[in-house]
Amino acid sequence: ASVTNGEFSYEFIVPKDINYTYGPGRISYYFANDSVDGSGFTEKIIVGGSSDEVTNDETGPLIELYMNDSNFIFGGLTDENPSIYALVNDDNGINTSGTSLGHDISAILDKNYTNPILLNDYYVATLNNYKNGKIIYPLSGLSDGNHTLSIKVWDVNNNSGKAYTEFVVANDAKLAISHVYNYPNPFT
């Protein structure tokens, strides 16, 4: 949220994964600009119940998955230290709470399902918009060759979206030259 004269407001939809019993809640927040950062919280809030304005949402988040930036193409080249770069959108918001079993934002590198990469803390909502944001997560020390990456993101209504990409780590000119793409096409 934008801060003006030390004040801010923010709207969001509470995930379905809450305890619906009325009771005390807590809102934690973090703020930063170019010269200062800080955090705080309030416990002056009662949480519970549900809204009469329930939406019929059965569609998961839309995810655009890249390596390093949005110029990446499926099967493209990276170095051994690329970043997961994902753009995420959902009309009702992204669930980043991490409080419900199996509803974390997660990535699977090279089909290693026993060691998912948890990305909840790496999701950053677009300023003043809870409906979309991006994930940037640094990877390091990847071996030369072909790699796969899948990502799963949940919205606040417990719908999931998935995306998948493949990439090649190439620190060797011979490997890199064997993986040529005509992109963008046509060349200008």
Task: Tell what function each PLM region has.
Residues 66-69, 77, 172-188:
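Surface-exposed, proline-anchored Ser/Thr-rich loop/turn motifs
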